[in-house]
């Protein structure tokens, strides 16, 4: 078995080298700034340490993940990254998993052409979901990319069939147990492969049955995952939370099936129309026209049986649902982190170009996708630069705030109860206007809300402070309404034994 593995790796040497080098190059150009600077902010501030108490959940970051149904996320972190957010190491781990996922995808579709390998790596690495993760959710970046890898491997083992397909079940449990939305990667790749097989004139019945087999394996993985989630929560004395996009929130709304389907398709379509950077809309519009031409050429193939054409059409209609299944399961609510699979539509276009074998069309699509990747690289670096500027500005502000507290007579660090009211009033710079639309980047400071002060003092300032709870803070806001805002004189006051500082 070992000899067989080394023999396989030897045959894969060139493809592996291309994939890893391309992923590393794309990753460093697009996200290197985020990996090399301490731009930890938003949720990655509140979950910097795996076992730290959180501001918006009465428990640790690990318990929060488990309550969301991501019970394998803490396990992954302890096995690979450790208990803290380490930007450079997390980034390198993420690129490693992305490279392996791209290689697995290449094996799935038998991609050996160097140009297509490079584009596959670019699509997996330089997309807005990875950018949002790096900018504001760095604590989840490498774990989520590991979930992508598990989803790709699940599709590979499904394709192999025989006893290997049983490995699809635990791999999907891993995917769901780290980040549920990455299940869409598995669904998308299965649909891609079914479409390509139908184009190659494989029997529609055979493809249909294989598709049902993929659904059955996914259902089995989902059942095992759900049962394990309940068991883990029961053993740890936790309840599955209905907050955010956790498992307990699935299909709990009052929306009907038709309403959910509409929301799912619309959120997928609008992703390519309204998501920043806005220039990508033009490229997406041209790619849509190219896709129509490709489909016309494919459906014009006389040798292609009618059942195949009908099944291809059905799969294309279902593709947005598969890529955005999280929206359907989450009552129509979805954000950028949950839409990683949507960007794989670029890969499908290139695979169709390879099948049609029209050089002009292939070059046209490559140019457009290349422009999208370039636009994403530029956008990600703008966002990381903005985050770094805000990091430094916030550090300066909070250093002065800490000094103001320490100069107040009677204040004892770590013992006196403190209430900091409001957050920084940094102005949004018009040059960064589109970056504020990205999930997690809408706030002009690493301290997104008042619930993040505890994390900031412990993570960045490493200064002891005893902050009051949110209920007490809201009570004090009314009593401190007439206080001037920092740094004006009189911005601090003692109210019922609590030192209050009004920031804004």
Please state what every model-predicted region is.
Residues 122-123, 303-328, 370-371:
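Transmembrane alpha-helix segments characteristic
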Residues 165-166, 288, 354-379:
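Signature aromatic-anchored transmembrane alpha helix within multi-pass, membrane-resident enzymes
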């Amino acid at each position: 078995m070992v000899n067989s593995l080394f023999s396989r790796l030897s045959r894969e040497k060139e493809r592996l080298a291309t994939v890893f080098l391309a992923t590393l190059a794309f990753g460093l150009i697009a996200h290197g700034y985020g990996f090399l600077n301490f731009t930890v902010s938003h949720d990655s501030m509140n979950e910097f340490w795996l076992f730290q108490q959180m501001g918006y959940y009465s428990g640790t970051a690990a318990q929060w993940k488990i309550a969301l149904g991501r019970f394998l996320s803490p396990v992954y972190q302890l096995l690979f990254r450790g208990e803290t957010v380490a930007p450079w190491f997390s980034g390198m781990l993420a690129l490693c998993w992305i490279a392996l996922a791209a290689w697995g995808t290449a094996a799935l579709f038998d991609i050996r052409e160097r140009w297509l390998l490079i584009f596959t790596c670019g699509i997996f690495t330089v997309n807005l979901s990875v950018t949002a993760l790096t900018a504001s959710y760095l604590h989840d970046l490498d774990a989520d990319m590991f979930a992508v890898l598990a989803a790709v491997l699940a599709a590979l083992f499904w394709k192999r069939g025989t006893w290997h397909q049983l490995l699809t079940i635990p791999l999907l449990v891993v995917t769901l147990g780290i980040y549920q939305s990455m299940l869409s990667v598995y669904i998308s790749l299965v649909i891609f492969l079914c479409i390509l097989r139908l184009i190659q004139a494989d029997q529609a019945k055979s493809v249909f049955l294989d598709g049902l087999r993929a659904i059955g394996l996914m259902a089995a993985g989902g059942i095992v995952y759900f049962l394990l989630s309940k068991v883990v929560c029961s053993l740890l004395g936790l309840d599955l939370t209905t907050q955010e996009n956790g498992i307990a929130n699935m299909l709990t709304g009052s929306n009907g099936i038709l309403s959910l389907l509409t929301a799912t398709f619309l959120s997928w379509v609008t992703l390519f129309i309204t998501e920043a950077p806005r220039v990508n809309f033009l490229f997406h519009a041209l790619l849509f026209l190219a896709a129509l031409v490709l489909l016309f050429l494919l459906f014009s193939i006389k040798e292609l049986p009618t059942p195949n054409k009908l099944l291809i059409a059905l799969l294309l209609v279902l593709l947005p649902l598969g890529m955005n299944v999280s929206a359907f399961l989450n009552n129509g609510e979805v954000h950028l982190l949950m839409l990683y699979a949507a960007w794989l539509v670029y890969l499908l276009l290139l695979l169709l170009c390879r099948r049609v074998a029209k050089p002009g069309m292939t070059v046209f699509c490559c140019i457009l996708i290349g422009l999208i990747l370039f636009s994403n690289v530029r956008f990600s670096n703008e966002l990381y630069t903005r985050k770094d500027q805000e990091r430094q500005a916030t550090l300066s502000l909070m250093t002065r705030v800490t000094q103001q507290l320490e100069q107040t007579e009677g204040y004892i660090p770590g013992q006196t109860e403190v209430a900091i009211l409001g957050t920084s009033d940094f102005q949004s710079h018009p040059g960064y206007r589109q970056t504020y639309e990205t999930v997690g980047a809408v706030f002009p400071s690493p301290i997104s809300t008042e619930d993040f002060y505890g994390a900031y003092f412990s993570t960045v300032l490493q200064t002891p402070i005893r902050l009051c709870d949110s209920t007490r803070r809201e009570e004090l806001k009314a009593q401190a309404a007439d206080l001037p805002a920092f740094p004006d004189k009189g911005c601090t006051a003692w109210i019922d034994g609590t030192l209050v500082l009004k920031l804004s």
